[in-house]
């Protein structure tokens, strides 16, 4: 129906630069191991870009029947209810979402950061983890993931005061697997100072 649109996705090695044309970024099952082993905590994700500009994102938490959507010109909602922008709280009253291996190996100081928080949650799905960031249930999410894992949350998060950066504080390339952090802009300097990634 849209022959001039492109797809970026993990399945079938579908690749197209999000900066070129109209691009749909798709992840039909995020959290595959959770899906197989537990039958829950997996997500369906989609994002849409025009010439590199994110127009909207969608994360569907299947087992909880929660649909997160919006971003760009659209309000971000969960099952139709508007989500508020990030509301600052002391770090020691917040939880962190993370890749288990990166946390246990203190990758780029991640465990150092976690020591200043209430605790760490390893959920096994980027989509589930980042949707909980959007709801204010997690301060941020840290993992090594690909564009189809983070595109939807990036678009929605920008609308709510979050940013997606590499673990060294750089913009993402939207082309490869990278170690990323999805964090509130308001806490960025503080978080990066604990990680040792803040630019001088």
Residue ranges and their predicted role:
Residues 1-29, 193:
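N-terminal subdomain of lithium-sensitive/metallo-dependent phosphomonoesterases centered on the IMPase/IPPase/PAP
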Residues 7, 32, 61, 70, ...:
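Residue-level signal for inorganic ion chemistry
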Residues 9-11, 80, 124:
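Short loop/edge segments at beta-strand edges and connector loops
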Residues 18-74:
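DPxDG-like acidic metal-binding loop motif
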Residues 53, 75-78, 82-84, 163, ...:
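Short helix-loop capping/hinge motifs at secondary-structure junctions, enriched
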Residues 62-92:
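ATP-dependent small-molecule kinase catalytic core of the GHMP/sugar-kinase superfamily
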Residues 87-200:
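An extended, acidic
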């Amino acid at each position: 129906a849209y022959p001039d649109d492109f797809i970026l996705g993990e399945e079938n090695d579908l690749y197209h630069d999000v900066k070129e044309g109209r691009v749909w970024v798709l992840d039909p099952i995020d959290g595959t191991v959770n899906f197989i082993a537990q039958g829950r905590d997996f997500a369906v994700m989609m994002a849409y870009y025009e010439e590199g500009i994110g127009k909207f994102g969608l994360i569907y938490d299947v087992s909880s029947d929660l649909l997160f959507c919006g971003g760009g010109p659209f309000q971000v909602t969960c099952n139709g209810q508007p989500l508020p922008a990030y509301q600052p709280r002391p770090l020691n009253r917040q939880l962190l979402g993370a890749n288990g291996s990166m946390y246990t190996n203190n990758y780029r100081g991640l465990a150092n950061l976690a020591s200043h928080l209430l605790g760490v949650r390893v959920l096994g799905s980027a989509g589930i983890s980042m949707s909980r960031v959007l709801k204010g249930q997690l301060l941020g999410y840290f993992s090594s993931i690909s564009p189809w894992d983070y595109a939807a949350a990036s678009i929605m998060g920008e609308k709510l005061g979050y940013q997606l950066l590499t673990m060294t504080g750089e913009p993402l390339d939207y082309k490869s697997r990278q170690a990323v952090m999805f964090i509130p802009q308001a806490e960025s300097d503080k978080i990066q100072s604990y990680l040792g990634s803040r630019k001088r």
